Amino acid sequence: MNTFHLMLNLVKNAIEGTAFPKAEFSEKTLKDLFELSSDYSLANIVGYALINGGVLGSDEYSACFKNTVCAAVFLDAQMQRELGAMSRVFKSSGIEYIPLKGAVLKQYYPESWFRSCSDIDILVHKDDLEKAAEVLENELSYVPVHKGTHDISFFSKSSVHIEFHYELIEKDF
């Protein structure tokens, strides 16, 4: 079985919650598997399957997989905490919003941290944009970092990246 098919089988096992047949993996196989699954943003899921299969040891690439799983779980928890805090302050301020993309899709994965995300995308009505930005800055200490043609970016104190979208389609597109 080549590395790509091995990766797909491990992802399938993780998603279905089934065990991967017990096997020995060489350090080269783990290296190739880690590099390939990282390229596809699947190293966290592949790592989870390998951990559940009892495959990982104490070598360098086993550690890479374990660290990737831990980082994915940690980032997901941070993002969920920030989204919850934002939801509370927006509700109390009367700001309507719609979470977009990964923040919504995560609920359909067996584990929310299976869905790799680098930011939280939020649709805010253009009329509420200034108020929403002010609430994030004043009540949650977010820092604005960029204003584009269809979004504004912020970072939380814990380095979670939030994008307010006020246009779903770029005007220059």
Predicted regions: what they are:
Residues 1-118, 124-173:
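Conserved NTP-donor binding/palm subdomain of two-metal-ion nucleotidyltransferases/polymerases, i.e.
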